[in-house]
Amino acid sequence: GQWGASISYAGQMFGLPVRVYMVRVSYDQKVFRRSTMTAWGSEVIASPSELTKAGRDALAADKNCRGSLGLAISEAVEDAINDPNTCYTLGSVMNHVCMHQTVMGLECKKQLAKIDEYPDIVIGACGGGSSFSGIAFPFLSDKLYDEPKAKNLRCIAVEPTSCPSLTKGVFTYDFGDASGYTP
């Protein structure tokens, strides 16, 4: 959704073709987001699709499969693996995306500084981790460098009760996609 829109915009600006695999339930529910991507010239595909083995396997197992982020990632990675002219961009789930996600926290810090404020608590969603790191890391940097304004700072990660990743389950490595393509 948001990453697809960002990449679609960048593709338009630089004259690059973009294909977005969008989770089917989001594809159906977020018509405006999808139309924004297509307006910027992207091909938007509902995942699971018939275009990849990962998509076909998911549809064979459940013809009404609504998709998942992991499955959409699998389809995009598979597409990139099979086409030497294709590059894959990842907007979440992996550690290296934390850097560009910090734009959120940096922007927040700047806006708060304009009104001479600093938060006591920073709260962020945590699933794949990039949204939380995006909002929290710029503030945690202040805490690590013993900035007086950050003395009482608390950063709180909030997870969904339906699929907690911090408080329940097994602490182990998991792939960022459904097919195990990602490291």
Give each language-model segment a name.
Residues 19-25, 156-159:
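Short internal beta-strands
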Residues 6-8, 14, 30-36, 40, ...:
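Glycine-rich phosphate/pyrophosphate-binding loop at beta-loop-alpha junctions
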Residues 78:
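Glycine-rich, acidic and aromatic/proline-enriched surface loops and short helix-turn segments
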Residues 1-4:
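N-terminal cofactor/phosphate-binding cores enriched in small/glycine residues
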